[in-house]
């Protein structure tokens, strides 16, 4: 069993999603958004750090998964996003959590089956996969999709390791 915290970082809205993985079964534990309504960036970063720390304390995750930075057209936006990611990662590292990063395209490919999927498609698939009564908010859905991606990637890595071990022992042909 593992609890995974997924984070969709943003300097104004940071989505989070928490799921439990038992074997191949995924279950929803919680999700939402950390909204920073102050104008100055240092105060927003402080709120993101405090919010992520509070979520970690509440859910006690085993793994922390976050979206990688993509190259934005606006350099200022990309820098702010990078800073938001940074404080979220520091919150995880301060709690001794292992950090995993996934590209947005990989997340969409894993959850929807198309790397260029729309936000509404991600929301629908997250709702379906986690058996939710309604679509989660867009940023929370993205964070849940990041957590789901971590489960799939880690499950595949474990299966590959077991296959290699069995091959080395002469059990696979």
From Swiss-Prot:
The reaction(s) catalysed by this protein are: Endonucleolytic cleavage at a junction such as a reciprocal single-stranded crossover between two homologous DNA duplexes (Holliday junction)
The record's subcellular locations are: Cytoplasm
One Gene Ontology molecular-function label: DNA binding
Q: How is the cofactor bound?
A: Binds 2 Mg(2+) ion per subunit.
One GO term under biological process is:
DNA repair
**Cytoplasm keyword on record:** yes
Instruction: Report residues binding Mg(2+) 1.
Output: 8, 139
**Binding positions for Mg(2+) 2 per the UniProt entry:** 67
Lineage, please?
Bacteria, Pseudomonadati, Pseudomonadota, Gammaproteobacteria, Enterobacterales
Which organism does this sequence originate in?
Escherichia coli O139:H28 (strain E24377A / ETEC)
CDD domains in alphabetical order: RuvC (cd16962)
Family, as annotated: Belongs to the RuvC family.
Its required cofactor(s), as named, are: Mg(2+)
Q: What's the protein here called?
A: Crossover junction endodeoxyribonuclease RuvC
EC class = hydrolase
Q: Name one GO cellular component term.
A: cytoplasm
Query: Which catalytic residues are annotated?
Result: 8, 67, 139
InterPro entries to which the protein is assigned, alphabetical:
RNaseH-like_sf, RNaseH_sf, X-over_junc_endoDNase_Mg_BS, X-over_junc_endoDNase_RuvC
Q: What does this protein do?
A: The RuvA-RuvB-RuvC complex processes Holliday junction (HJ) DNA during genetic recombination and DNA repair. Endonuclease that resolves HJ intermediates. Cleaves cruciform DNA by making single-stranded nicks across the HJ at symmetrical positions within the homologous arms, yielding a 5'-phosphate and a 3'-hydroxyl group; requires a central core of homology in the junction. The consensus cleavage sequence is 5'-(A/T)TT(C/G)-3'. Cleavage occurs on the 3'-side of the TT dinucleotide at the point of strand exchange.
Task: Decide whether keyword Cell inner membrane is in the record.
Answer: no
- This protein's UniProt keywords: Cytoplasm, DNA damage, DNA recombination, DNA repair, DNA-binding, Endonuclease, Hydrolase, Magnesium, Metal-binding, Nuclease
């Amino acid at each position: 069993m593992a609890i995974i915290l997924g984070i969709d970082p943003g300097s104004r809205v940071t989505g989070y999603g928490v799921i439990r993985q038992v074997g191949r079964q995924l279950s929803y534990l919680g999700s939402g958004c950390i909204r920073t309504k102050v104008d100055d960036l240092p105060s927003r970063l402080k709120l993101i750090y405090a919010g992520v720390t509070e979520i970690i304390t509440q859910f006690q995750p085993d793994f922390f998964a976050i979206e990688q930075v993509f190259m934005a057209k606006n350099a200022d936006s990309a820098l702010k996003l990078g800073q938001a990611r940074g404080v979220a990662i520091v919150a995880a590292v301060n709690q001794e959590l292992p950090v995993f990063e996934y590209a947005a395209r990989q997340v969409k490919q894993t959850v929807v089956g198309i790397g260029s999927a729309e936000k509404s498609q991600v929301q629908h698939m997250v709702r379906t996969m986690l058996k939710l009564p309604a679509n989660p908010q867009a940023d929370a859905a993205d964070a849940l999709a990041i957590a789901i991606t971590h489960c799939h990637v880690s499950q595949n890595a474990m299966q590959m390791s077991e296959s290699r071990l069995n091959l080395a022992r002469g059990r696979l042909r």
